[in-house]
């Protein structure tokens, strides 16, 4: 599991579909091959977007990673410089959407470059239940929840991978049907972006932007999947914690033995709390970028859809697609964040449901009461200094997008 070399990651991706199908074919819940985290990390490594200690020790890998980030920043600036050339509000909106998207891509891959070693530690921390608490678990309820989470995560990867490839094809094929433009409105030195003046250079740039777009979309998809898997695995661990707490009430043992088992479960709870704090620190920059980009992308694409509907239906359809992508992306973050929020407060109910806990010794009753009190403070993934990823934040973002949309309509 700890071997994260380039060849081992390639081998892991080769067996992904076989392992996924083997889990789907299980008639009763069994052990999962590995956490779905490892597939995403392997894909990021193959994209040269995961320079952890082991891969960064390879000079070629390190230089490729730096080249990729420089390439993204270069394309961002060519798009930014082209912004004054926009002829109307529709073209300007199109440029702003892509500039926002490219800024989001760069921010996320930059933070992945900085935090990949911390993410390795997080992935290892999520193995705590199987490694420390219950290394040889055969409980069908626990195995069933682990299997369900594995299937959801892996299925999400597969479906998002297909959707992103469709979106990528729409980006670089659409200009071919138009006026011979680059996939992104850009300005290059010596007017290399002009098909009539530099046809060979134009087609080189066209292919280069298309390949960069495909690589960027795959990269941001996998970075997002790391974050969403962090949310889902946290919710799963909290669910397993609730199961372990409730099972304590079924134990017919002495108070001393009960207290030993209870302390093991409490250590698991403390581990989850610390894990959420570590994840918030590791992903904070990416969380902030996600909230700001979601707000801008939803607002601009919705406004441009309405502005272009009567003038340019093709552009309107393009903005609808961009709006849906932004909605889906924000929805995934907020729904999975809400799972963590709701499951963390369920721990208090699980502790209260321990059978006959009021008949235990005063020390045990005090410890259980402390767990109930602590669990009433929900665990949240927060984009500090902004809001947590919950459905409440989702509705707040949509409400503010609507207000901004109304303001832009009035200004026209």
From Swiss-Prot:
Give yes or no: UniProt keyword Transmembrane: yes
Q: What biological-process terms (Gene Ontology) are attached?
A: detection of chemical stimulus involved in sensory perception of smell; response to pheromone; sensory perception of smell; signal transduction
Q: Which GO terms describe its molecular function?
A: ionotropic olfactory receptor activity; odorant binding; olfactory receptor activity
Its membrane topology is listed as:
Multi-pass membrane protein
Pfam families noted in UniProt: 7tm_6
Q: Which residues lie on this side of the membrane: Extracellular?
A: 96-103, 191-229, 324-330, 411-412
Q: Where, per UniProt, does this protein localize?
A: Cell membrane
Q: Which domain of life is it from?
A: Eukaryota
Q: Any S-S bridges, and between which cysteines?
A: none
Among its keywords, does the record have Kinase?
no
Protein name as annotated: Odorant receptor 47b
Origin organism is Drosophila melanogaster
Q: Which gene encodes it?
A: Or47b
